Design a protein with these regions (language model features):
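Polybasic/polar functional segments that serve as interface/processing modules
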Residues: 1-34, 43-78, 92-94, 101-130
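Conserved acidic residues
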Residues: 35, 84
Length: 130
């Protein structure tokens, strides 16, 4: 599977379960084993596990191999190994402490997020100026 397609699927899987602060880094120059690092935050152990499970399910549905998942028991930091992409799902405190963004220091990959659906219905009334 093309790395960009796989990357988009990972980001979509994380956003489906309300993953926060999702970033993708191109680390091909820093690591010979994988090309991308994806980092996302979850607010609770349950959400961190759900985010990792969402990535795992999406990849399996697309026919991509999941090489391993580590950290589910503790769920402060769960790592999903997809071969050419490594996904880190972390609590905000763990993310701040380990600071993987600085460690990898790779080039952040820009990706197009799907456009949000317009909200239909009544709009809030305008405020009057005094």
């Amino acid at each position: 599977m093309d790395i960009r397609k796989k990357q988009r699927a990972v980001v979509a899987a994380l956003e489906d379960v309300k993953g926060r602060e999702v970033v993708v880094y191109n680390v091909a120059r820093h690591a010979s084993i994988f090309e991308r690092v994806v980092i996302a935050s979850g607010d609770s152990n349950r959400q961190v596990n759900a985010l990792a499970a969402s990535v795992q399910q999406r990849m399996k549905a697309l026919g991509a191999r999941v090489y391993g998942v580590e950290g589910r028991r503790n769920a402060d930091w769960v790592l999903v190994d997809l071969g050419d992409i490594v996904v880190h799902v972390m609590h905000p405190a763990a993310r701040s402490y380990y600071n993987l963004e600085e460690l990898w220091g790779g080039k952040e990959v820009s990706f197009k997020r799907p456009a949000a659906a317009p909200v239909r219905g009544k709009t809030a009334p305008r405020r009057r100026r005094k």
